[in-house]
């Protein structure tokens, strides 16, 4: 049977991107569909933004501590809008690296939602039907709604 791709990945997060690059490096014709942004939860709205927030939040105490070691740090302040802009710039940079890695490895990318419609068949939200010998589902997950006491104060990746 003839297929459009040897391997097609649904999901452009860390797992999907890695699978696509490895399959392509093994000589396979590879396609990947991502409906949101390349990089997945970790890069776009999870690990990376959290680490940037933690990094920025540590400066206040570091400024105070530095005064005991000869530094003269006066009138420090934090500008939330500048932080948000810088965080978004870093996430954009990382997303571009994920995308560039796919392109450099010869992976055909689709900025689309993909859905299985049968054995070896996928339909994109553009109504394009794609066939693939192998299909990898790398769609990640979603946090569940929390029902514990104090849940209204919790923040999820979504």
Ranges and model annotations:
Residues 2-5, 21-28, 33-158:
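Glycine-rich flavin
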